[in-house]
Amino acid sequence: MAEKRNIFLIGPMGAGKSTIGKYLSETLHMDLYDSDQEIERRTGADIAWVFDVEGEEGFRKREEQVISDLSELQGIVLATGGGAIKSPLTRNRLSARGIVVYLETPIEKQLARTQRDKRRPLLRTEEPPREVLTRLADEREPLYREIADYVVRTDELTAKQVATQIVELLGL
């Protein structure tokens, strides 16, 4: 790969962005970053705490800054948070600074992958998880598609197979 382009993974919670990102970075010998992990590193607190103390709006501002900073790097794989695309600024930066791959994942798969994960603030509500995920999908799906250079379904493949498919799609 002569020019090291960035690869940005977007999609809902439970899509496998972090795991698929790991395989992509290993295969392509690119550095891997995870925006949620970077927020935790910078704040010294976990995402749930940031949500509790600063609310979703405060978290999104931090996320916007982290993605702005990381997307300026070259030759990286970045796994974004599921709601990162809510910010027009973030959508513009991702589109302008790399290849955006939307990991499309049905609600059923998201439920199966997130049901035991207590670290997801948007699922820690009275609202049933299926309703939360459906509402988020309705809000975010158009935004994912708006900036996606590629759309890859993740429901029938392992994370490693999805990473291989992305490498083939990108011709890398």
UniProtKB/Swiss-Prot annotation:
Recorded metabolic or biological pathway in which this protein acts: Metabolic intermediate biosynthesis; chorismate biosynthesis; chorismate from D-erythrose 4-phosphate and phosphoenolpyruvate: step 5/7
Domain of life where this protein originates: Bacteria
Cofactor note: Binds 1 Mg(2+) ion per subunit.
Keyword field: Amino-acid biosynthesis, Aromatic amino acid biosynthesis, ATP-binding, Cytoplasm, Kinase, Magnesium, Metal-binding, Nucleotide-binding, Transferase
SUPFAM superfamilies: P-loop containing nucleoside triphosphate hydrolases
One GO cellular component, as annotated: cytosol
InterPro entries attached to this UniProt entry: P-loop_NTPase, Shikimate/glucono_kinase, Shikimate_kinase/TSH1, Shikimate_kinase_CS
EC number per UniProt: 2.7.1.71
Gene Ontology molecular function, alphabetical: ATP binding; magnesium ion binding; shikimate kinase activity
Subunit structure: Monomer.
Stated name of the protein: Shikimate kinase
Encoding gene per record: aroK
